[in-house]
Amino acid sequence: MSNVPADLKYTDEHEWIRTEADGTLTVGITDHAQSTLGDIVFLELPAVGKSVSAGDAVGVVESVKAASDIYSPVSGEIIAINEEAADSPEEVNSDAYGVWLFKIKLADGASTDKLIDADAYGKLID
């Protein structure tokens, strides 16, 4: 089984989400996702300031085997992207939970209720 940290939330599309002290959300792809994709060679990240809805495709991760969309886990505004990850996408393979992709501020009235916990995500990928 892949590594699934208990302190994070997850999506069915294999993104991980960490809620920061200021209420913003930090998003990356899971260890299972990077393992399935193989050697990651390119990341296309969303534009800072972009408003997105939950489930929107906001970026792309490309590996030597495949390309996969990155989805927004919630509705909100992209407030930061990880330029270092875009410049060195292979780092996601070595530290999927340490390398974040983007940060998002929840839209008014938006919720994290549809995110799943580590136990549910672990069952999803087993």
UniProtKB/Swiss-Prot annotation:
Cofactor note: Binds 1 lipoyl cofactor covalently.
Domain Lipoyl-binding: 24-105
Keywords: Lipoyl
Family, similarity comment: Belongs to the GcvH family.
Cofactors that this protein relies on: (R)-lipoate
InterPro entries in the record: 2-oxoA_DH_lipoyl-BS, Biotin_lipoyl, GCV_H, GCV_H/Fam206, GCV_H_sub, Single_hybrid_motif
Alphabetized Pfam families for the sequence: GCV_H
Transmembrane segments: none
GO biological process, one term: glycine decarboxylation via glycine cleavage system
Name recorded for this polypeptide: Glycine cleavage system H protein
Modification N6-lipoyllysine, positions: 65
GO cellular component, one term: glycine cleavage complex
